Swiss-Prot record:
InterPro entries: G_ENGA, GTP-bd, GTPase_Der, KH_dom-like, KH_dom-like_a/b, P-loop_NTPase, Small_GTP-bd. GTP 1 binds at residues 9-16, 56-60, 119-122. GO terms for biological process: ribosome biogenesis. Residues 3-167, 187-360 form the EngA-type G domain. GTPase that plays an essential role in the late steps of ribosome biogenesis. Associates with the 50S ribosomal subunit. It comes from the Bacteria. Keywords: GTP-binding, Nucleotide-binding, Repeat, Ribosome biogenesis. This is GTPase Der. Gene3D superfamilies: 3.30.300.20, P-loop containing nucleotide triphosphate hydrolases (3.40.50.300).
Amino acid sequence: MSFTLAIVGRPNVGKSTLFNRLVGKRLALVDDRPGVTRDRREGDARLGDLAFRIVDTAGLEEADADSLEGRMRAQTETAIGDADALLFLIDARVGLTPTDRAFASLARRSGKPTILVANKSEGRGGEAGAMEAYELGLGAPVPLSAEHGEGLSDLYDAICEALPAQTAPQEEDEETEEAEANPNRPIKVAVIGRPNAGKSTLINRLLGEDRLLTGPEAGITRDSISVEVTWNGRALEVFDTAGLRKRARIEDKLEKLSAADALRAMKFAEVVVVLMDATKPFEEQDLRIADLVVREGRALVLGYNKSDLVGPAAFSRLREEADHWLPQVKGVPIVPLSGLTGRGLDKLVEAIAATYAVWNTRIPTNPLNRYLQEATDSHPPPAVSGRRVKIRYMTQPKARPPSFVLFCSRPEALPESYLRYITNGLREAFSLPGVPIRLTLREKGNPYADKDK
Protein backbone atom coordinates (compact mmCIF):
# COMPACT_ATOMS: atom_id res chain seq x y z
CA MET A 1 0.00 0.00 0.00
CA SER A 2 1.46 3.37 -1.01
CA PHE A 3 1.89 6.26 1.39
CA THR A 4 3.49 9.72 1.58
CA LEU A 5 6.25 10.92 3.90
CA ALA A 6 7.21 14.58 4.37
CA ILE A 7 10.74 15.52 5.43
CA VAL A 8 10.59 18.55 7.73
CA GLY A 9 13.14 20.41 9.80
CA ARG A 10 15.18 23.58 9.94
CA PRO A 11 17.79 24.50 7.28
CA ASN A 12 21.03 22.52 6.92
CA VAL A 13 20.02 19.40 8.84
CA GLY A 14 20.38 17.20 5.74
CA LYS A 15 16.82 17.04 4.39
CA SER A 16 17.87 17.18 0.74
CA THR A 17 20.61 14.60 1.26
CA LEU A 18 18.09 12.19 2.79
CA PHE A 19 15.62 12.99 -0.02
CA ASN A 20 18.25 12.16 -2.66
CA ARG A 21 19.20 8.96 -0.87
CA LEU A 22 15.62 7.70 -0.69
CA VAL A 23 14.73 8.74 -4.26
CA GLY A 24 18.02 7.45 -5.66
CA LYS A 25 18.58 10.46 -7.92
CA ARG A 26 20.01 13.93 -7.47
CA LEU A 27 16.67 15.72 -7.67
CA ALA A 28 17.52 18.13 -4.86
CA LEU A 29 20.66 20.22 -4.42
CA VAL A 30 22.46 19.09 -1.31
CA ASP A 31 23.72 22.55 -0.31
CA ASP A 32 20.58 24.59 -1.04
CA ARG A 33 20.91 28.36 -0.70
CA PRO A 34 18.08 30.89 -0.36
CA GLY A 35 16.58 31.54 -3.78
CA VAL A 36 17.67 28.30 -5.46
CA THR A 37 14.14 26.90 -5.35
CA ARG A 38 10.97 27.82 -3.57
CA ASP A 39 8.97 24.72 -4.46
CA ARG A 40 8.49 21.56 -2.49
CA ARG A 41 10.29 18.70 -4.19
CA GLU A 42 8.56 15.35 -4.55
CA GLY A 43 9.75 11.98 -5.75
CA ASP A 44 9.05 8.26 -5.74
CA ALA A 45 11.16 6.67 -3.03
CA ARG A 46 12.09 3.15 -2.08
CA LEU A 47 13.52 1.75 1.13
CA GLY A 48 13.80 -2.02 1.19
CA ASP A 49 10.46 -3.42 0.11
CA LEU A 50 8.67 -0.14 0.91
CA ALA A 51 7.65 2.06 -2.03
CA PHE A 52 6.28 5.49 -1.17
CA ARG A 53 6.06 9.17 -2.12
CA ILE A 54 8.56 11.48 -0.44
CA VAL A 55 8.23 15.28 -0.09
CA ASP A 56 11.23 17.49 0.67
CA THR A 57 9.96 20.72 2.22
CA ALA A 58 12.62 22.77 0.47
CA GLY A 59 10.68 26.00 0.98
CA LEU A 60 11.59 25.86 4.64
CA GLU A 61 15.23 26.38 3.81
CA GLU A 62 14.63 29.64 1.95
CA ALA A 63 12.76 31.34 4.77
CA ASP A 64 14.40 33.96 6.95
CA ALA A 65 14.27 33.60 10.71
CA ASP A 66 11.77 36.44 11.10
CA SER A 67 9.28 34.64 8.83
CA LEU A 68 9.20 31.52 10.93
CA GLU A 69 5.58 32.09 11.97
CA GLY A 70 4.61 33.12 8.43
CA ARG A 71 5.88 31.69 5.18
CA MET A 72 7.82 28.82 6.79
CA ARG A 73 4.80 27.66 8.73
CA ALA A 74 2.57 27.80 5.64
CA GLN A 75 5.00 25.64 3.66
CA THR A 76 5.34 23.19 6.51
CA GLU A 77 1.62 22.87 7.09
CA THR A 78 1.02 22.20 3.39
CA ALA A 79 3.52 19.35 3.42
CA ILE A 80 2.19 18.00 6.71
CA GLY A 81 -1.38 18.10 5.47
CA ASP A 82 -0.56 15.95 2.43
CA ALA A 83 1.57 13.42 4.31
CA ASP A 84 0.69 10.19 6.07
CA ALA A 85 3.68 10.59 8.39
CA LEU A 86 6.56 12.99 9.00
CA LEU A 87 10.32 12.52 9.02
CA PHE A 88 11.45 15.24 11.43
CA LEU A 89 15.19 15.85 11.06
CA ILE A 90 17.60 17.43 13.50
CA ASP A 91 21.38 17.86 13.25
CA ALA A 92 22.84 15.56 15.92
CA ARG A 93 26.21 17.33 15.77
CA VAL A 94 24.68 20.73 16.56
CA GLY A 95 21.99 19.63 19.00
CA LEU A 96 18.60 21.28 19.48
CA THR A 97 17.94 24.88 18.47
CA PRO A 98 14.88 27.12 19.03
CA THR A 99 13.91 26.49 15.40
CA ASP A 100 13.96 22.73 15.99
CA ARG A 101 11.64 23.19 18.94
CA ALA A 102 9.27 25.37 16.88
CA PHE A 103 8.98 22.77 14.12
CA ALA A 104 8.57 20.00 16.70
CA SER A 105 5.60 21.90 18.11
CA LEU A 106 4.03 22.01 14.64
CA ALA A 107 4.62 18.30 14.21
CA ARG A 108 2.99 17.44 17.53
CA ARG A 109 -0.06 19.60 16.85
CA SER A 110 -0.56 17.97 13.44
CA GLY A 111 -1.45 14.66 15.05
CA LYS A 112 0.44 12.87 12.25
CA PRO A 113 2.81 10.00 13.11
CA THR A 114 6.24 11.59 13.45
CA ILE A 115 9.58 9.80 13.14
CA LEU A 116 12.33 11.76 14.84
CA VAL A 117 15.59 11.40 12.90
CA ALA A 118 18.93 12.45 14.42
CA ASN A 119 20.88 13.02 11.20
CA LYS A 120 24.68 13.34 10.97
CA SER A 121 25.03 10.79 13.77
CA GLU A 122 28.15 9.18 12.33
CA GLY A 123 31.01 9.07 14.82
CA ARG A 124 30.92 10.18 18.43
CA GLY A 125 30.19 13.81 17.58
CA GLY A 126 26.47 13.11 17.21
CA GLU A 127 25.87 11.14 20.41
CA ALA A 128 25.07 14.15 22.62
CA GLY A 129 22.69 15.69 20.08
CA ALA A 130 20.87 12.41 19.61
CA MET A 131 20.33 12.11 23.37
CA GLU A 132 19.18 15.74 23.57
CA ALA A 133 16.53 15.02 20.91
CA TYR A 134 14.48 13.14 23.51
CA GLU A 135 13.51 16.56 24.91
CA LEU A 136 11.28 17.20 21.88
CA GLY A 137 8.74 14.65 23.11
CA LEU A 138 8.58 12.88 19.73
CA GLY A 139 9.83 9.52 20.93
CA ALA A 140 13.20 7.85 20.54
CA PRO A 141 15.32 9.38 17.75
CA VAL A 142 16.58 7.24 14.87
CA PRO A 143 20.36 7.78 14.55
CA LEU A 144 21.13 8.26 10.86
CA SER A 145 23.76 9.46 8.45
CA ALA A 146 22.00 10.39 5.21
CA GLU A 147 25.33 11.18 3.58
CA HIS A 148 26.96 7.83 4.35
CA GLY A 149 23.83 5.66 4.28
CA GLU A 150 24.15 4.52 7.89
CA GLY A 151 21.02 3.74 9.90
CA LEU A 152 18.68 3.10 6.96
CA SER A 153 17.62 -0.27 8.34
CA ASP A 154 16.61 1.46 11.60
CA LEU A 155 14.68 4.05 9.59
CA TYR A 156 12.92 1.21 7.76
CA ASP A 157 11.84 -0.30 11.09
CA ALA A 158 10.65 3.09 12.38
CA ILE A 159 8.51 3.69 9.27
CA CYS A 160 6.93 0.24 9.61
CA GLU A 161 6.17 0.95 13.28
CA ALA A 162 4.69 4.39 12.53
CA LEU A 163 2.52 3.17 9.63
CA PRO A 164 1.70 -0.48 10.37
CA ALA A 165 -1.38 -0.64 8.12
CA GLN A 166 0.37 0.88 5.09
CA THR A 167 3.55 -1.19 5.46
CA ALA A 168 2.09 -4.57 6.46
CA PRO A 169 2.52 -7.40 3.92
CA GLN A 170 -0.64 -7.91 1.91
CA GLU A 171 -2.35 -11.27 1.54
CA GLU A 172 -1.85 -10.93 -2.20
CA ASP A 173 1.58 -9.44 -2.49
CA GLU A 174 1.35 -6.37 -4.74
CA GLU A 175 4.97 -6.77 -5.81
CA THR A 176 4.29 -10.36 -6.80
CA GLU A 177 1.32 -9.26 -8.89
CA GLU A 178 3.49 -6.66 -10.59
CA ALA A 179 6.14 -9.25 -11.40
CA GLU A 180 3.57 -11.72 -12.72
CA ALA A 181 1.97 -9.01 -14.85
CA ASN A 182 5.36 -8.13 -16.36
CA PRO A 183 7.54 -11.26 -16.34
CA ASN A 184 10.09 -9.58 -18.62
CA ARG A 185 11.02 -6.82 -16.20
CA PRO A 186 14.64 -6.86 -14.96
CA ILE A 187 15.51 -9.04 -11.98
CA LYS A 188 16.84 -6.91 -9.13
CA VAL A 189 20.23 -8.26 -8.09
CA ALA A 190 22.70 -7.27 -5.37
CA VAL A 191 26.20 -8.70 -5.11
CA ILE A 192 27.63 -8.66 -1.60
CA GLY A 193 30.45 -10.33 0.22
CA ARG A 194 33.65 -9.92 2.17
CA PRO A 195 36.32 -7.44 1.08
CA ASN A 196 38.68 -8.81 -1.57
CA ALA A 197 36.19 -11.47 -2.65
CA GLY A 198 36.11 -9.80 -6.07
CA LYS A 199 32.72 -8.02 -5.99
CA SER A 200 33.80 -4.96 -7.97
CA THR A 201 35.67 -7.02 -10.56
CA LEU A 202 32.68 -9.30 -11.07
CA ILE A 203 30.12 -6.50 -11.34
CA ASN A 204 32.23 -4.47 -13.75
CA ARG A 205 32.71 -7.58 -15.89
CA LEU A 206 28.94 -8.09 -15.84
CA LEU A 207 28.30 -4.45 -16.74
CA GLY A 208 31.07 -4.39 -19.31
CA GLU A 209 32.50 -1.11 -18.05
CA ASP A 210 34.39 0.36 -15.11
CA ARG A 211 32.47 3.59 -14.69
CA LEU A 212 30.82 2.65 -11.37
CA LEU A 213 34.17 2.30 -9.66
CA THR A 214 34.44 6.10 -9.65
CA GLY A 215 31.18 5.99 -7.74
CA PRO A 216 28.18 8.27 -7.43
CA GLU A 217 28.84 11.78 -6.25
CA ALA A 218 28.56 12.54 -2.56
CA GLY A 219 24.95 12.90 -1.51
CA ILE A 220 23.46 10.52 -4.07
CA THR A 221 22.46 7.23 -2.52
CA ARG A 222 24.82 4.36 -2.97
CA ASP A 223 22.16 1.95 -1.80
CA SER A 224 19.45 2.41 -4.42
CA ILE A 225 21.26 3.56 -7.58
CA SER A 226 20.96 0.79 -10.13
CA VAL A 227 22.15 0.00 -13.62
CA GLU A 228 20.23 -2.18 -16.05
CA VAL A 229 22.22 -4.69 -18.05
CA THR A 230 21.20 -7.43 -20.48
CA TRP A 231 23.26 -10.63 -20.45
CA ASN A 232 22.39 -13.22 -23.10
CA GLY A 233 18.89 -11.80 -23.38
CA ARG A 234 18.26 -11.76 -19.62
CA ALA A 235 17.58 -8.29 -18.16
CA LEU A 236 19.11 -7.57 -14.76
CA GLU A 237 18.96 -4.49 -12.57
CA VAL A 238 22.23 -4.54 -10.65
CA PHE A 239 22.17 -2.36 -7.56
CA ASP A 240 25.05 -0.10 -6.70
CA THR A 241 25.50 -1.15 -3.09
CA ALA A 242 28.36 -0.79 -0.64
CA GLY A 243 30.69 -2.81 -2.85
CA LEU A 244 30.61 -0.20 -5.63
CA ARG A 245 32.16 2.77 -3.88
CA LYS A 246 35.20 4.74 -4.91
CA ARG A 247 38.49 2.89 -4.59
CA ALA A 248 39.62 5.27 -1.85
CA ARG A 249 36.45 4.65 0.12
CA ILE A 250 36.81 0.90 -0.27
CA GLU A 251 40.28 1.13 1.24
CA ASP A 252 39.33 3.57 3.97
CA LYS A 253 35.86 2.49 5.06
CA LEU A 254 35.10 -1.00 3.84
CA GLU A 255 37.78 -2.99 5.63
CA LYS A 256 34.97 -5.35 6.49
CA LEU A 257 31.38 -5.60 5.31
CA SER A 258 29.18 -4.89 8.30
CA ALA A 259 25.84 -6.58 8.87
CA ALA A 260 24.17 -3.20 8.33
CA ASP A 261 25.75 -2.83 4.88
CA ALA A 262 24.54 -6.29 3.89
CA LEU A 263 21.06 -5.63 5.21
CA ARG A 264 20.73 -2.36 3.27
CA ALA A 265 21.93 -4.03 0.08
CA MET A 266 19.44 -6.87 0.46
CA LYS A 267 16.44 -4.62 0.93
CA PHE A 268 16.79 -3.33 -2.63
CA ALA A 269 17.24 -6.74 -4.25
CA GLU A 270 15.20 -9.80 -5.16
CA VAL A 271 18.17 -12.10 -5.70
CA VAL A 272 21.34 -11.69 -3.64
CA VAL A 273 24.61 -13.14 -4.86
CA VAL A 274 26.92 -13.77 -1.92
CA LEU A 275 30.39 -13.81 -3.42
CA MET A 276 33.02 -15.97 -1.71
CA ASP A 277 36.75 -16.22 -2.29
CA ALA A 278 37.40 -19.81 -3.41
CA THR A 279 40.71 -19.81 -1.58
CA LYS A 280 38.98 -18.98 1.73
CA PRO A 281 35.33 -20.09 1.47
CA PHE A 282 32.74 -20.13 4.22
CA GLU A 283 34.44 -17.98 6.78
CA GLU A 284 32.28 -16.72 9.62
CA GLN A 285 31.42 -13.51 7.79
CA ASP A 286 30.24 -15.42 4.70
CA LEU A 287 27.83 -17.42 6.86
CA ARG A 288 26.59 -14.34 8.69
CA ILE A 289 25.86 -12.55 5.42
CA ALA A 290 24.13 -15.60 3.89
CA ASP A 291 22.03 -16.01 7.03
CA LEU A 292 20.93 -12.36 6.77
CA VAL A 293 19.86 -12.96 3.17
CA VAL A 294 17.74 -15.92 4.25
CA ARG A 295 16.18 -14.09 7.19
CA GLU A 296 15.28 -11.20 4.91
CA GLY A 297 13.48 -13.67 2.64
CA ARG A 298 15.58 -12.99 -0.45
CA ALA A 299 16.60 -15.55 -3.06
CA LEU A 300 20.20 -16.65 -2.55
CA VAL A 301 22.96 -17.63 -4.99
CA LEU A 302 26.51 -18.43 -3.85
CA GLY A 303 29.24 -17.23 -6.19
CA TYR A 304 32.51 -19.18 -5.89
CA ASN A 305 34.91 -16.55 -7.24
CA LYS A 306 38.58 -17.21 -8.10
CA SER A 307 37.63 -20.86 -8.58
CA ASP A 308 40.39 -21.20 -11.18
CA LEU A 309 42.85 -21.08 -8.27
CA VAL A 310 41.55 -24.30 -6.64
CA GLY A 311 40.82 -27.83 -7.81
CA PRO A 312 37.48 -29.63 -8.38
CA ALA A 313 37.77 -31.46 -5.05
CA ALA A 314 37.46 -28.14 -3.23
CA PHE A 315 34.21 -27.40 -5.06
CA SER A 316 32.76 -30.78 -4.04
CA ARG A 317 33.53 -30.02 -0.40
CA LEU A 318 31.88 -26.64 -0.79
CA ARG A 319 28.57 -28.28 -1.79
CA GLU A 320 28.64 -30.38 1.37
CA GLU A 321 29.55 -27.40 3.55
CA ALA A 322 26.77 -25.27 2.06
CA ASP A 323 24.08 -27.83 2.89
CA HIS A 324 25.59 -28.29 6.36
CA TRP A 325 25.93 -24.64 7.31
CA LEU A 326 22.83 -23.36 5.46
CA PRO A 327 20.19 -26.08 5.93
CA GLN A 328 17.40 -23.51 5.70
CA VAL A 329 18.19 -23.09 1.97
CA LYS A 330 19.27 -26.63 1.17
CA GLY A 331 20.27 -26.99 -2.46
CA VAL A 332 21.25 -23.33 -2.84
CA PRO A 333 22.93 -22.78 -6.25
CA ILE A 334 26.73 -22.57 -6.12
CA VAL A 335 28.43 -21.19 -9.22
CA PRO A 336 32.19 -21.45 -9.77
CA LEU A 337 33.37 -18.39 -11.67
CA SER A 338 36.13 -15.91 -12.30
CA GLY A 339 35.24 -12.24 -12.29
CA LEU A 340 38.68 -11.48 -13.71
CA THR A 341 38.31 -13.59 -16.87
CA GLY A 342 34.51 -13.71 -17.09
CA ARG A 343 34.43 -17.51 -16.90
CA GLY A 344 31.20 -18.78 -15.36
CA LEU A 345 29.18 -15.58 -15.76
CA ASP A 346 26.73 -17.34 -18.11
CA LYS A 347 26.12 -19.96 -15.41
CA LEU A 348 25.76 -17.25 -12.78
CA VAL A 349 23.04 -15.42 -14.72
CA GLU A 350 21.28 -18.74 -15.36
CA ALA A 351 21.37 -19.50 -11.63
CA ILE A 352 20.00 -16.04 -10.81
CA ALA A 353 17.09 -16.53 -13.23
CA ALA A 354 16.34 -20.06 -12.01
CA THR A 355 16.44 -19.10 -8.32
CA TYR A 356 14.27 -16.06 -9.03
CA ALA A 357 11.67 -18.36 -10.65
CA VAL A 358 11.69 -20.67 -7.62
CA TRP A 359 11.39 -17.64 -5.31
CA ASN A 360 8.21 -16.66 -7.19
CA THR A 361 6.66 -20.15 -7.00
CA ARG A 362 2.94 -20.45 -6.18
CA ILE A 363 1.50 -23.88 -5.41
CA PRO A 364 -2.23 -24.58 -5.90
CA THR A 365 -4.12 -25.52 -2.76
CA ASN A 366 -5.13 -29.03 -3.90
CA PRO A 367 -1.63 -30.44 -4.52
CA LEU A 368 -0.42 -28.60 -1.43
CA ASN A 369 -2.92 -30.41 0.77
CA ARG A 370 -2.32 -33.74 -0.95
CA TYR A 371 1.30 -33.37 0.09
CA LEU A 372 0.25 -32.43 3.62
CA GLN A 373 -1.99 -35.49 3.90
CA GLU A 374 0.79 -37.81 2.73
CA ALA A 375 3.31 -36.17 5.06
CA THR A 376 1.10 -36.45 8.14
CA ASP A 377 0.05 -40.01 7.29
CA SER A 378 3.64 -41.20 7.04
CA HIS A 379 4.83 -39.21 10.04
CA PRO A 380 1.99 -37.97 12.32
CA PRO A 381 2.71 -35.05 14.65
CA PRO A 382 3.86 -36.20 18.09
CA ALA A 383 1.45 -36.29 21.02
CA VAL A 384 2.02 -33.63 23.66
CA SER A 385 0.68 -34.21 27.18
CA GLY A 386 -1.19 -37.22 25.87
CA ARG A 387 -3.00 -35.20 23.18
CA ARG A 388 -2.17 -35.31 19.49
CA VAL A 389 -2.10 -32.11 17.47
CA LYS A 390 -4.60 -32.19 14.61
CA ILE A 391 -3.19 -30.90 11.31
CA ARG A 392 -6.12 -29.56 9.29
CA TYR A 393 -4.95 -27.91 6.05
CA MET A 394 -2.37 -25.62 4.46
CA THR A 395 -2.51 -22.59 2.15
CA GLN A 396 0.06 -20.40 0.40
CA PRO A 397 -0.96 -16.73 0.82
CA LYS A 398 2.10 -15.29 -0.95
CA ALA A 399 5.32 -15.96 -2.79
CA ARG A 400 8.63 -14.03 -2.82
CA PRO A 401 9.63 -16.09 -0.81
CA PRO A 402 7.16 -19.02 -0.80
CA SER A 403 5.14 -18.54 2.40
CA PHE A 404 2.68 -21.05 3.81
CA VAL A 405 0.10 -21.07 6.60
CA LEU A 406 -0.51 -24.35 8.43
CA PHE A 407 -3.82 -24.60 10.27
CA CYS A 408 -3.84 -26.95 13.25
CA SER A 409 -5.53 -27.48 16.62
CA ARG A 410 -2.68 -26.46 18.96
CA PRO A 411 0.06 -24.49 17.15
CA GLU A 412 2.11 -23.95 20.29
CA ALA A 413 2.44 -27.72 20.80
CA LEU A 414 4.11 -28.49 17.47
CA PRO A 415 7.87 -28.97 18.02
CA GLU A 416 10.45 -27.28 15.81
CA SER A 417 11.61 -30.68 14.56
CA TYR A 418 8.17 -31.37 13.06
CA LEU A 419 8.06 -27.95 11.40
CA ARG A 420 11.45 -28.70 9.82
CA TYR A 421 10.03 -32.00 8.59
CA ILE A 422 7.10 -30.21 6.91
CA THR A 423 9.37 -27.53 5.45
CA ASN A 424 11.93 -29.98 4.07
CA GLY A 425 9.09 -32.03 2.60
CA LEU A 426 7.72 -28.94 0.84
CA ARG A 427 11.15 -28.21 -0.59
CA GLU A 428 11.52 -31.73 -1.96
CA ALA A 429 7.93 -32.27 -3.14
CA PHE A 430 7.64 -28.99 -5.06
CA SER A 431 11.27 -28.44 -6.14
CA LEU A 432 12.04 -25.39 -4.02
CA PRO A 433 15.84 -25.57 -3.65
CA GLY A 434 17.87 -22.68 -2.38
CA VAL A 435 15.12 -20.27 -1.30
CA PRO A 436 13.76 -19.48 2.15
CA ILE A 437 10.45 -21.16 2.99
CA ARG A 438 8.30 -19.42 5.57
CA LEU A 439 5.82 -21.45 7.59
CA THR A 440 3.28 -19.78 9.87
CA LEU A 441 1.01 -21.66 12.26
CA ARG A 442 -2.59 -20.71 12.94
CA GLU A 443 -5.13 -22.31 15.19
CA LYS A 444 -8.23 -23.68 13.49
CA GLY A 445 -11.02 -25.11 15.60
CA ASN A 446 -13.84 -27.44 14.65
CA PRO A 447 -16.48 -25.30 12.86
CA TYR A 448 -19.25 -27.72 13.96
CA ALA A 449 -18.27 -27.91 17.62
CA ASP A 450 -20.98 -25.50 18.81
CA LYS A 451 -23.56 -26.33 16.15
CA ASP A 452 -26.04 -28.17 18.42
CA LYS A 453 -25.50 -26.14 21.58
